[in-house]
UniProtKB/Swiss-Prot annotation:
GTP binds at D42, H43, G44, K45, S46, T47, N158, K159, I160, D161. Its main location: membrane. Residues 1-22 are annotated as: Disordered. This is Elongation factor 4. Belongs to the TRAFAC class translation factor GTPase superfamily. Classic translation factor GTPase family. LepA subfamily. GO terms for cellular component: plasma membrane.
Length: 630
């Protein structure tokens, strides 16, 4: 471990030699600048961060690789940033030496919580916009987050080297939103490095230095924590007051637990141990703790002796918005799945889970996620990093059900839908912001109205781009709304959503019955108006997927005891007369009667085994017709 750490960034690179002043901690706060980059997916922030690493000389040319800060395979493969990363960079303006902390943030809507944590650790933000695409809904959401926290915003247009770039038009768009002049918008190219030097100079000039009391009790804010197999939990902190040194005892203020500080260091961009951290500095702490829940993101770290009494403000626990069941294909993998989820939780504070059993799928977990991408990525990581094969049930949101007698139930799983007289049901709502070219307004409005959306307002950002604001039930945007939106707008629309309370709705639970028995994995909660369509879709899909039996199998969709849709799987008929060559008709009749009796008995006692593939296919959103033939 240490060998690799010392070798990374050891000798000077081909460019400028690696400067030593940034490696010394306890820098004067006036010479520190903390900033993050806000951008939509694919607008080039990881590439811009790469250029900054090269320009400041902290990464040698031979060790450079694209998306240097995206450490997970899945991040590099999908080209998205999931975990917030941070790096300490040296920079000179004239003869003055500065230390810049760059905190790289995710851009996807599900990871807004990661962004809000990164923003807490900064004083400034670079608003990065693709000069060929313009501002997107997600960028706007993160920009408003940064404005709420009073960060200094530096607007920047990236990818100006592209032939399709139209910097003048988009500079006007940015100026319109941020209230600056179009001439103030910087123009850079992360790929070729044009304008990156000027951008770093602007960061030093515009972003305010961190403010804190160097002699007060130590207070540092945790903005991320990751799990390292060799060293336990590595906690990333930003020091606000006082100083933190190794070999001290520290206390986590939310849990009150005390730990020994084994190592304190900086990331530049590989971890380097240091003599401590002072006001405004960003670095990591290692306490030897094995459970990441002990170093909660957003918690305040202070000294155990003479520590602070007031924690830093600005943290909430992330609330899961989407629930889905995860089950191992092989039941014996259940303990492995439990350990895997425990380990993932070390890196992912927003993941919630509890054990559950399903008649159809066996033992598994009900997991809570921030959104669909978060769910997909968690599942991907479980399959990849732990070699598990999983089935996930269709995702659903959290409903509040009020019964006739006034009792309340919170439903995270259709199986727990209460029986009996229901007075009212409340479902979570979201505020959606959609940004798209203005020619697609009609198609977007039609889609949103079909999904029970209400138009809240509409703004033209420029003559050709429009921002639509809708209030919609979260259950409606969960499954394939984003795909439908993209296909109706030729891929140009971008979507962002935030929770906005709850609303009463006419919702029902649709059960799928096989031979009169409900299969819990297929139950779903839908709006009454869409129940017929859902029932019809599921029954016809299952008819294709369940193998034929020796007896007829009815597949029914029901609301309570009312059947709303039915399909039959025809029986396979064994030819019992094959052994009769000619012969008497009564002999044949006897065999046929016997078969009929057998079928009748089978029908009453026979059980239909639903194959795993049928579960997987039925729970995926695509229809059977779309599936490629094997």
């Amino acid at each position: 471990m240490t060998v690799a750490r010392n070798r990374a960034g050891a000798g000077p690179g081909k460019g400028s030699p690696i400067s030593s002043f940034a490696d010394k901690t306890f820098t004067d706060p006036a010479r520190i600048r903390n900033f993050c980059i806000i951008a939509h997916i694919d607008h080039g922030k990881s590439t811009l961060a790469d250029r900054m690493l090269q320009l400041t000389g902290v990464v040698e040319e031979r060790q450079m690789r694209a998306q240097y800060l995206d450490r997970m395979d899945i991040e590099r493969e999908r080209g998205i940033t999931i975990k917030a990363q941070n790096v300490r960079l040296p920079w000179k303006v004239g003869d003055e030496e500065f230390v810049i902390h760059l905190i790289d943030t995710p851009g996807h809507v599900d990871f807004t919580y990661e962004v809000s944590r990164a923003l807490e650790a900064c004083e400034g933000a670079v608003l990065l916009v693709d000069a060929a695409q313009g501002i997107e809904a997600q960028t706007l959401a993160n920009l408003y987050l940064a404005m709420e926290k009073d960060l200094t915003i530096i607007p920047v247009l990236n990818k100006i080297d592209l032939p399709a770039a139209d910097p003048d038009r988009y500079a006007e768009e940015i100026a319109h939103i941020t209230g600056c002049e179009p001439g103030d918008v910087l123009r850079v190219s992360g790929k070729t490095g044009i304008g990156v030097k000027e951008l770093l100079d602007e960061v030093v000039r515009q972003v305010p230095a961190p403010v804190g009391d160097p002699d007060g009790p130590a207070r540092a804010m945790i903005f991320d924590s990751v799990y390292d197999a060799y060293r336990g939990v590595v906690t990333y902190v930003r020091v606000v007051d006082g100083r933190i040194s190794p070999r001290e005892k520290i206390t986590m203020m939310s849990t009150g637990t005390t730990h020994d500080l084994i190592e304190v260091g900086i990331i530049s961009p590989e971890p380097k141990a240091s003599i401590g951290l002072g006001v405004g500095e960003v670095g990591y702490l290692i306490t030897g703790v094995k459970d990441v829940r002990q170093s909660r993101v957003g918690d305040t770290v202070t000294a155990a002796r003479g520590g602070a009494t007031e924690p830093l403000v600005g943290y909430r626990d992330p609330k899961p918005m989407v629930y889905s069941g995860l089950y191992p294909l092989d039941g014996s993998d259940y303990p492995v799945l439990r350990d895997a989820l425990d380990k993932l939780r070390l890196n992912d504070a927003a993941l919630a889970y509890e054990p559950e059993t399903s008649v159809a799928l066996g033992f598994g977990f009900r997991c809570g996620f921030l959104g669909l991408l978060h769910m997909e990525i968690t599942r991907d990581r479980l399959e990849r990093e732990f070699g598990l094969e999983l089935i996930s049930t269709s995702p659903n949101v959290v409903y509040r059900v009020v019964m006739e007698d006034g009792s309340e139930h919170v439903v995270t799983n259709p199986s727990y839908w209460p029986e009996g007289k229901i007075r009212e049901v409340y479902e979570p709502m979201v505020k959606c912001t959609i940004i798209a070219p203005s020619e697609f307004i009609g198609a977007i409005m039609e889609l949103c109205q079909n999904r029970r959306g209400e138009l809240g307002g509409m703004d033209y950002l420029s003559e050709t781009r429009v921002e639509l604001r809708y209030e919609m039930p979260m259950g409606e945007i969960m499954f394939d709304f984003f795909d439908a939106l993209k296909s109706r707008t030729k891929g140009y629309a971008s979507l962002d959503y935030e929770e906005s309370g709850e609303q009463q709705a006419d919702l029902v639970k649709v059960d799928i019955l096989l031979q009169g028995e409900a299969v819990d994995a297929f139950s779903s909660i839908v709006h009454r108006s869409a129940a017929g369509a859902y029932g019809g879709r599921m029954t016809s899909k299952l008819r294709e997927l369940i193998p034929r039996q020796q007896f007829e199998v009815p597949i029914q969709a029901a609301i309570g005891s009312k059947i709303i849709s039915r399909e039959n799987i025809r029986a396979i008929r064994k030819d019992v007369l094959a052994k009769c060559y000619g012969g008497d008709i009564s002999r044949k009749r006897k065999l046929l009667e016997k078969q009929k009796e057998g079928k009748k008995r089978m029908k009453t006692i026979g059980r239909v085994e639903v194959p795993q593939e049928a579960f997987v296919a039925a729970l995926s959103s695509e229809s059977v017709g779309d599936k490629p033939k094997k």
